[in-house]
From Swiss-Prot:
Family label: Belongs to the ligand-gated ion channel (TC 1.A.9) family. Acetylcholine receptor (TC 1.A.9.1) subfamily. Beta-4/CHRNB4 sub-subfamily.
UniProt subunit comment: Neuronal AChR is composed of two different types of subunits: alpha and beta. CHRNB4/Beta-4 subunit can be combined to CHRNA2/alpha-2, CHRNA3/alpha-3 or CHRNA4/alpha-4, CHRNA5/alpha-5 and CHRNB3/beta-3 to give rise to functional receptors.
Protein name: Neuronal acetylcholine receptor subunit beta-4
Disulfide bonds: 133-147
Extracellular side: 4-216, 267-278, 460-470
Binding site for Na(+): 242
Membrane topology (Cytoplasmic): 238-245, 300-438
Signal peptide stretch: 1-3
Entry GO terms, CC: acetylcholine-gated channel complex; neuron projection; plasma membrane; postsynaptic membrane; synapse
Originating organism: Gallus gallus
Lineage of producing organism: Eukaryota, Metazoa, Chordata, Craniata, Vertebrata
Main location: membrane
Length: 470
């Protein structure tokens, strides 16, 4: 007979209804345990849905056991020592994924089982599992997750079958790398319940680490750049009128990023994701920059008619702080300033203020003008007596017209002097606002750099999630 005839004869013999019932557990007696060796082979990590907390994987569930009823002598059947029998024609252990998330407990395809002549059976069905996975969002997007696959018999307890872990690690021989996750480890463990002797399961821990490049490019770097714009608010001149506009725009941009984060991570109150902490940190900074900008603008637009500058403000913001902030106030070269090095002469009244000059009892007048207004002149200075055009007036009164002109000139001089003083105070207030701006610029740069580095260095020191028994 041919090999095909021998195989058909063997198949009919093994699966004959008279000697084999696929509904009966392959045990010699009721007290015998059927040992099931189990190993998971990971083919693909399809996705991890953070918001729904579901991990989708493509695995091969390798199961091995012995069915004494399917043993034969190869010499009786043309030396055939292995058969491939459709799985639905033999007894199968009803091992299912206990922590599935979509109600699909069984495998995707009932493949053929490989049966050896000694009765050992190896069944390797593929399955796409959606398992519940508790997402730890504390270090997102630099996070590491521990998702488990828990396998257990649905109807048989520990008194009927014994689940044995074939190897301590899941197989990755046929694994296709994921673009989002790195596999850190796939340890397996066999779990028994001391309080329930009938309980046994096999659990695999999928310890995976996220590849953060996508979120770094699309979330973190834009947030850092937007935060730097908030810092530049303090370098913006107060006169341009765009300080508040820039602050509000940056705050709105950060709010949009915060909404994006809320759609990615699960709505849990146990932890705040790292990127969420950073966004809140930057939003607090921007809010504080708005408050400080309001204060700076208030100082910038102060005047002598509304505010008096306290001495301590002059001491701190005009004398002390600028040196520490590397600021140097330019010299005031206003043409209205009095000459600083006016030389003292015998005619020192020439250096007096206009009001004092005209009110003084002695000053120079033109001789022609003096005759016209009947002024008495006298030569009292040696260095002036030689001049024919100018003489000194002694203490005589002016005519009403001249006195009125002198009063007008004196009023104008006093008004100009008052304007100069007011303008000087206004410039002082503006410089104080500039110093405050520069002070907060350095403070914000320091806080922003330290806060950013401190937050994003945390994942480097996180502990790896280890597999622990429940």
């Amino acid at each position: 007979s041919t090999a095909a005839d021998a195989e058909e004869k063997l198949m009919n013999h093994l699966l004959s209804p008279d000697r084999y019932n696929k509904l009966i557990r392959p045990a010699v007696n009721s007290s015998q345990l059927v040992s099931i060796e189990l190993q998971v082979s990971l083919a693909q990590l399809i996705s991890v849905n953070e918001r729904e907390q579901i991990m989708t994987t493509n695995v091969w569930l390798n199961q091995e056991w012995i069915d004494y009823r399917l043993a034969w002598k190869p010499s009786d059947y043309e030396g055939i020592n292995m058969l491939r029998i459709p799985a639905k024609h033999i007894w199968l252990p009803d091992i299912v994924l206990y922590n599935n998330a979509d109600g699909t407990y069984e495998v995707s395809l009932y493949t053929n089982a490989i049966v050896q002549n000694n009765g050992s059976i190896r069944w390797l069905p593929p399955a796409i599992y959606k398992s519940a996975c508790k997402i730890e969002v504390k270090h997102f997007p630099f996070d590491q997750q521990n998702c488990t696959l828990k396998f257990r018999s649905w109807t048989y307890d520990h008194t009927e079958i014994d689940m044995v872990l074939k190897t301590s690690m899941a197989s990755m021989d046929d694994f296709t790398p994921s673009g989002e996750w790195d596999i850190v480890a796939l340890p397996g463990r066999r779990t028994e319940n001391p309080l329930d002797p009938n309980y046994v399961d096999v659990t695999y821990d999928f310890i995976i680490k996220r590849k953060p490049l996508f979120y770094t490019i699309n979330l973190i770097i834009p947030c850092v750049l937007i935060t730097s714009l908030a810092i530049l608010v303090f370098y913006l001149p107060s006169d341009c009128g765009e300080k508040m506009t820039l602050c509000i725009s940056v705050l709105l941009a950060l709010t949009v990023f915060l909404l994006l984060i809320s759609k990615i991570v699960p709505p849990t109150s146990l932890d705040v994701p790292l990127i969420g902490k950073y966004l809140m940190f930057t939003m607090v900074l921007v809010t504080f920059s708005i408050v400080t900008s309001v204060c700076v603008l208030n100082v910038h637009h102060r005047s002598p008619s509304t505010h008096t500058m306290p001495p301590w403000v002059k001491l701190v913001f005009l004398e002390r702080l600028p040196a520490y902030l590397f600021m140097k106030r330019p010299e005031n070269n206003s043409p209205r300033q009095k000459p600083a090095n006016c030389k003292k002469t015998r005619a020192e009244n020439l250096c007096m203020d206009p009001a004092d000059f005209y009110k003084n009892s002695t000053y120079f007048v033109n001789t022609a003008s003096a005759k016209k207004y009947d002024m008495k002149i006298t030569d009292t200075l040696d260095n002036v007596s030689s001049h024919q055009d100018f003489r000194l007036r002694t203490g005589t009164k002016f005519s009403p017209e001249v006195q009125e002109a002198i009063d007008g000139v004196s009023f104008i001089a006093e008004h100009m002097k008052s304007d100069d003083n007011d303008q000087s105070v206004i410039e002082d207030w503006k410089y104080v606002a500039m110093v405050v701006d520069r002070l907060f610029l350095w403070i914000f740069v320091l806080v922003c750099v330290l806060g950013t580095v401190g937050l994003f260095l945390q994942p480097l020191f996180q502990n790896h999630i280890a597999a622990t028994n429940p």
